Amino acid sequence: MPKVAFLGDSISAGLHLAEDQAFPALLAQRMRGQPHAFRLINAGVSGDTTAGGLRRADWILKQRPDVVVVELGANDGLRGVPLDAIERNLRGILEKVRNAGAVPVVLGVRLPPSYGKEYVTGFEAIYPRLAHELGVAHVPFFMEGVAGAAEMNLEDGLHPTAKGHERLAANVEPALREAIASVKRAPQQP
């Protein structure tokens, strides 16, 4: 059974929810007993940034995942991290994943317009550009139907409720199924 790691922030971690209510666990539950079933490695860390994810990538790759879902960048954007640094870190993560023989999937993130048109536009362009340049799977906006929907988020307006996580799982599932199906790794060494 393939191993799927989620390298993410508080959204992957399921902040303020039970572990089995976070979208990575929901995806594992949905696919259990199916051809796309997988073992979950949830490496979501609340508050994590692309720089933190890049530092943690080697540790995650030591666990030999077949697929790595990268859900990072929101905390960078909310802190106004320079766009070139965000892109460099995401590129580094995706290249490490691919070089380790795993299939990367990058989840696109968006920012509120209050961060300024130039920054927001530049930020949102990073994900599809990297997906295209590196040839990796990409979910354009994995928070579609959740971001900005009060009934899908906790009182902070940033972190999804259990219902919101169900929608995230539905948004990510097609790309994850495709990534699992494409796993063509060489036999792992003992």
Role assignments for model-derived ranges:
Residues G47-A51:
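N-terminal helical cap/lid subdomain that shapes the substrate entry/recognition surface
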